[in-house]
Amino acid sequence: METGNLPDNTLILDSLIHSVLVINQEFIICYANHAALQVLAQSRRKLFETPFTDLFSYHSFDAELMQETLANGQSFTDNEVILVIHNQSHTMSLSAQPISEQHILLELAPMDSQRRLSQEQIQQAQQIAARELVRGLAHEIKNPLGGLRGAAQLLAKSLPDPALTEYTQVIIEQADRLRTLVDRLLGPQHPGKKTHQSIHHVVERVAQLISLECPENVTLLKDYDPSLPELSHYPDQIEQVLLNITRNALQAVEKTGGTIILRTRTAFQITLHGERHRLVARIDVIDTGSGIPPHLQDTLFYPMVSGREDGNGLGLSIARNLVDQHAGKIEFTSWPGNTEFSIYLPIK
């Protein structure tokens, strides 16, 4: 059967929308199609003979496992990798397979938007379920705590030896400490007064509070968009959200020194809770700390999840809950030297 004059292989590869690269056994790039040049923001001349892993300031895939798998003649696939290119984070799928004894074919494809949305919905449902479970447990703990404290007070009054009240006082103090923890688990019960004003009032107040806590080796920068429209929000709640996140950022940089950035921007065509918004407000909290460990990133907003030994894991869970009450969302990206939390709030 006649096949006609087929186009050159490179023309076929350049017509693909996904990034395709050919590397050798040492991971040195031998070829990159047009889509790869665009994603990597490099020319073919610069890419040629460059190690593949050197293209990224950070990558989440296991390069050693990938090299070992390919050396055994097997294909390697990671459906969700984070690649940081020119300080921009990209979530992609990575597949690699040997095409000869000397060469390996790599394909990079951006995560499908529908798949990303589905994952976000699953994670949100899991977080809501975990939050409701914790709230239920908190209520069950709170009820007997009141009885325990009251009994300790009555016992203190009836003790014949005043010296023994030292022990009942310990019971009362520990009951109060547990009640405070339970109240934090339940989150704020009174949202305060809702206002329609610039979000910069809240952001600036948080900046002032955090600046008082910053040691000399930490720089706090502010980058506000003056054209950001006013929006309806509960200032006390948004202040709590920003304080929780910014204090985490401060703890990430205060020992070694670094920078925290508070930034506001207008974002366009963003989906919040299943509704497409033409215009939303975005508040970013960025720090130059060591980053969030990969094993914590999928469950970071769950109650009681913390990357610090002395952390209680409630700050981000409460922040997520408060942003949800505003019909908004929180996203983050993190790698060593850069962690960015973005809060999206609808402008109506």
Swiss-Prot record:
Autophosphorylated. The keyword Ribonucleoprotein does not apply. The modification Phosphohistidine is found at residue 139. This is Sensory histidine kinase/phosphatase NtrB. Its main location: cytoplasm. One of its GO terms (biological process) is regulation of DNA-templated transcription. CDD domains: HATPase_Glnl-NtrB-like, HisKA, PAS. SUPFAM superfamilies: ATPase domain of HSP90 chaperone/DNA topoisomerase II/histidine kinase, Homodimeric domain of signal transducing histidine kinase, PYP-like sensor domain (PAS domain). Member of the two-component regulatory system NtrB/NtrC, which controls expression of the nitrogen-regulated (ntr) genes in response to nitrogen limitation. Under conditions of nitrogen limitation, NtrB autophosphorylates and transfers the phosphoryl group to NtrC. In the presence of nitrogen, acts as a phosphatase that dephosphorylates and inactivates NtrC. The keyword Transferase applies. Residues 136-348 form the Histidine kinase domain. Keywords: ATP-binding, Cytoplasm, Hydrolase, Kinase, Nitrogen fixation, Nucleotide-binding, Phosphoprotein, Transferase, Two-component regulatory system. GO terms for cellular component: cytoplasm. Residues 5-78 form the PAS domain. Gene3D superfamilies: 1.10.287.130, Histidine kinase-like ATPase, C-terminal domain, PAS domain. InterPro entries: HATPase_C_sf, His_kinase_dom, HisK_dim/P_dom, HisK_dim/P_sf, PAS, PAS-like_dom_sf, PAS_fold, Sig_transdc_His_kin-like_C. It catalyses: ATP + protein L-histidine = ADP + protein N-phospho-L-histidine. Coiled coil: none annotated. Its EC number is 2.7.13.3, 3.1.3.-. ATP binds at residue 329. The gene is ntrB.
